[in-house]
Amino acid sequence: MNWFVRILGLGAAPFVGFFLVLWGACFPAAAQSRYESVFNGHKIIYPQSSIPQPGRHHTNYFFVDSDAPQSSPPSGVETPGSLACVYKLVSGPTGCPVATSTAVPTGGWGAIAIVDAGDYPTAAADLAAFSSYYGIPPADLTVTWPGTKKPPVYSDWLGEEALDIEWAHAMAPNAKLYLVESSQVNTDPTWAAVQLAASLVAKAGGGVVSMSWGDPEVSQELSWDKYFTNKKVVFFAASGDSGLGVSIYPGASPNVVAVGGTHFNRDSNGNFINEVYYTGGGGGDLSPFEPRPSYQNGVSGIVGSHRGYPDVASDFCCAAIYLQGAWYSIGGTSWASPTFAGIVNAAANKAKGSVAELTMMYSELANPIEYADDFNDITQGAPQCKVGFDECTGIGSARTYAGK
């Protein structure tokens, strides 16, 4: 099946009630065209950057209900406080309701680097406004790029960049933050940008790099895995928004922590009920090219001889972002990756590279009591969601900072 058709939900992992429309965007910073779908009664709007096209990486985010600017955070979307409450990163009220879960994380060390495409001229101002609104300490942000020429603005990537820096900072506000912008003119984040991000984090003493973009897997990816091997850096990537069986790289790399997507069910009062796999989104797959890494030997009955992913998962929909003077509701594994990266940074276990981090997390499966204390095992949302590791959500989502 054509991967472009599958990623639009017309094949193996359809969105409920999916329909396709191509029309002009009203979102002021969006691309000239977009696709829409409907899921659980919500309109899902994909910017041009999230529509896979041959020869370029794509983002993994979408707007929810509307891509029109709003004067305040959309009603009901998760906040840094509500997400941190559900994941037991902070103390919060019973049920972790969005409206009253206001305590936010306070940790972070070293540095977090975000790799995206194109310049984001209002990055510092937007991050400051977001942080102030939610009571998050101001960020120490540096915007940089490979080489000497500042990249142009890619309007459909601005939502991605806002999402990445705002939520990574929200989870680990004490970490130095870098936004590394690719200077490639075709909007692809380049390996030069990834290498720059890793070097900056390493010079800061260590930390994490988050990459919320990707492309279908190809055989030459084996030669790219070397870019994610810095022993002072743990690399994270989105597992994609296309459901199960749709591959994506760099999420497929055994040297990257691939982050899938979940969804919080809440009652009419906004209280948390449970967390489920986000049906039709939060991609997972067995890599056709990457062999099973040693840290997955314990789940070989599921992955066989292949690298299986995602490794972990985080809430997929929906979050608030602040962009160019306005608020938007947004979702996707583009949210999940920087969020989980920030959580791992704040956990401050300071693993010596991605493989060390993954080895630590997968080792939790051997101790059921420890595993239940440290991860939320997601077993609902699709028939493939099982007890323990699965291709829906990997090991599961965060439960406290332990084991990360």
Where does each model-flagged region fall?
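Extracellular protease catalytic domains of secreted zymogens
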Residues: M171, A175, L179-K404
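A short catalytic or substrate-binding loop motif that flags glycine-/basic-rich loops and adjacent residues
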Residues: G11, T106, G304
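N-terminal zymogen propeptides
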Residues: C26-S183, T187, V201, V208, ...
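N-terminal secretory signal peptides that target proteins for export/translocation
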Residues: M1-A12
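Bacterial N-terminal signal peptides
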Residues: G11-A25
